Amino acid sequence: MSDYLVKALAYDGMARVYAAVTTETIKEAQRRHDTWSVSSAALGRTMTGTLFLGAMQKEDQKITVKIEGDGPIGPIVADSNAQGQIRGYVTNPHVHFSELNEAGKLDVRRGVGTSGMLSVVKDLGFGENFTGQTPIVSGEIGEDFTYYLATSEQINSSVGVGVLVNPDDTIEAAGGFMLQLLPGATDEIIDEIEKNLSTLPTVSRMIEAGETPETILAKLAGGEDKLQILEKIPVAFECNCSKERFGSAIISLGKEEIRSMIEEDHGAEAECHFCRNTYDFSEEELEKLYEEAK
């Protein structure tokens, strides 16, 4: 099944709810970055959370999320847009712990760390950026996104993200949900939401069992009849890197640096952090870039 995200309203229009299955997308990220179990879970959770923030944006806007904890994984970066395109990378892809956490799951908190920052940069188009930053509160990722939304954007939310990793480090299931209270939600609605959240199985297990974004939202809303589906968006790992972009980056290094590449290295190889694609530049190509540089 292809990955997709569903947007809906629930609780008499008093809550905005999103759910997504991202299994194939996170499989692609795992394959490209050769991530081990804990790194896979952390990257997959971050990418799914970023996907939800991207889905909140207008058509030409983009979101970049960076989680910088004090754990061995190092910084995690993901970006997404309103079209469901998502990419990401983790600084140390090879983190695995033989011990599980107290809940019997991969110890993502230990990998990410419990001290650090979650930063969100919104590219609003026209050269305008908005940056929000909150401290890491748990290192489990979902709770950190929840805290960011409540603190930086003043939106009471609940974000649940999960990745089920097989013993051979391949991805079995991935996805998540996001619920946001809208102005006017009553105490009764809040109580009902809390009750439904408390009985919700873990996201990765629901997806492993074959649940879809629609059925996850129905569980979240307390019944399919209580949902108003608004939109369904395809989700995929997409990277917009290109040789032209890397050429522009090389030009920005300046003539001296490019001359060094030509005379000492006799060429250059650039690798995209997000997708691991590599681009080779010959001496002749570098000479052309040298002419364009200042």
Curated annotation (Swiss-Prot):
Disulphide bonds in the chain: C239-C241, C272-C275
| Annotated localization | Cytoplasm
> A GO BP term, please?
protein refolding
Describe the PTM.
Under oxidizing conditions two disulfide bonds are formed involving the reactive cysteines. Under reducing conditions zinc is bound to the reactive cysteines and the protein is inactive.
Q: What GO CC annotations are associated with the protein? A: cytoplasm
Q: How far does the signal peptide extend, from start to end residue?
A: none
Q: What is its main location?
A: cytoplasm
Pfam families per record: HSP33
| Residue stretches spanning the membrane | none
Single GO molecular-function term? unfolded protein binding
Q: Which UniProt keywords apply?
A: Chaperone, Cytoplasm, Disulfide bond, Redox-active center, Zinc
At the top level of its lineage, which domain of life is listed? Bacteria
The record's function comment reads: Redox regulated molecular chaperone. Protects both thermally unfolding and oxidatively damaged proteins from irreversible aggregation. Plays an important role in the bacterial defense system toward oxidative stress.
Xref: PANTHER family:
33 KDA CHAPERONIN
Question: Belongs to which family?
Answer: Belongs to the HSP33 family.
Q: What is this protein called?
A: 33 kDa chaperonin
Q: What is the organism field in this record? A: Listeria innocua serovar 6a (strain ATCC BAA-680 / CLIP 11262)
Lineage of source species: Bacteria, Bacillati, Bacillota, Bacilli, Bacillales
